[in-house]
Every structure is written in structure tokens, then in C-alpha cells.
């Protein structure tokens, strides 16, 4: 009764516990077989058969310790590849201290995907502006091509992921963002 309830609970669990379902059911089946084998070997049915003291043929020795249900090494070996992906936390690939000079490094993906204005705002494209365009309407494609500002939290995070080199003012020839670098009519 308890074993079926356990198997039902494991079967009901989703996601991470799916590999455990196969493991638990096979372990349970092995335990039942091993328990019946142990009981068959431990009974006195075969007491009248005598084995020679020294045998010329190697025989299979079966001990209760080998037949028990504790397959801890098998469980650990099966679950070892799954555990790092479960326990892995989301991280920013930010180098706080470089190996050679001990300085912070810029995350290159930030430089490729975002543009920092001198006033501290970050500009980005909308997500999915290149994806599955065949099923998007022209109006939606136009909206996705627009540039938008990042919010305060995103801007602070992006500032932490870049060095001071990327925060300096640049004077590019024919810069289309020249009029947006400085905020005007801003009441502080």
C-alpha cells in the first residue's frame, strides 16, 4: 500500500522528478525480486544438499548485503549529471577582477546589444525584432524595429557590466543619436 502511494507521488511530480520516477520504479522492482530471493535462499529447503569444502569450479556467492535495496552508488551516478543543471543559479558573466591586472572587464554582449547615451540612458531594440517575421503583421514588425529606452533597474545593471571607457562622451561624424545624448527640458 505504502509502496504504491510512493510510486503514485513520484509519478505525479513533474519536471525535475521525472528521472527519479524511472529510478524509483526500477529500484522498487529490484527490491521485491531481491527480497523474494533472500527469503528463498534463507529457508531450510536446501539443507540436505551438501557442497564440497573445496570446489574446482568457481561459484557465484550471493550475500544478503549484495541483494539489499540500497543502490546508493547507482542513484548518485544517475543523478550526478542532473544535479548541476538544477542547482545552477543565473549569473552575469561579469569579470570582477581580471587575472593580469585585477581590473573589471566589460561584458561584450552589452556593447553589441545596447547603446549608452551620455546622459546615462540605455537604448535597445525590442525583443524578437528578427524572429519569425513571416507570421507577424507589417504593423507589428514596424513596432518591433523601434528603439526603446531601458528602465532604471536595467540601466543600473548595464552600467555595472561596463567600464568607464564605454561611459565617456564620443563625438562621431554624422551621429544619428547626437541630439539624444543630452536631456533637455528636464526638471530635477
Curated annotation (Swiss-Prot):
One of its GO terms (biological process) is mitochondrial translation. InterPro entries: Ribosomal_bL35-like, Ribosomal_bL35_sf, Ribosomal_bL35m. GO terms for cellular component: mitochondrial inner membrane; mitochondrial large ribosomal subunit; mitochondrial ribosome; mitochondrion. Component of the mitochondrial large ribosomal subunit (mt-LSU). Mature mammalian 55S mitochondrial ribosomes consist of a small (28S) and a large (39S) subunit. The 28S small subunit contains a 12S ribosomal RNA (12S mt-rRNA) and 30 different proteins. The 39S large subunit contains a 16S rRNA (16S mt-rRNA), a copy of mitochondrial valine transfer RNA (mt-tRNA(Val)), which plays an integral structural role, and 52 different proteins. Keywords: Mitochondrion, Ribonucleoprotein, Ribosomal protein, Transit peptide. The keyword Transferase does not apply. It is found in: Mitochondrion. Belongs to the bacterial ribosomal protein bL35 family. This is Large ribosomal subunit protein bL35m. It comes from the Eukaryota. The gene is MRPL35. GO terms for molecular function: structural constituent of ribosome. It comes from Homo sapiens (Human). It holds the Pfam family Ribosomal_L35p.
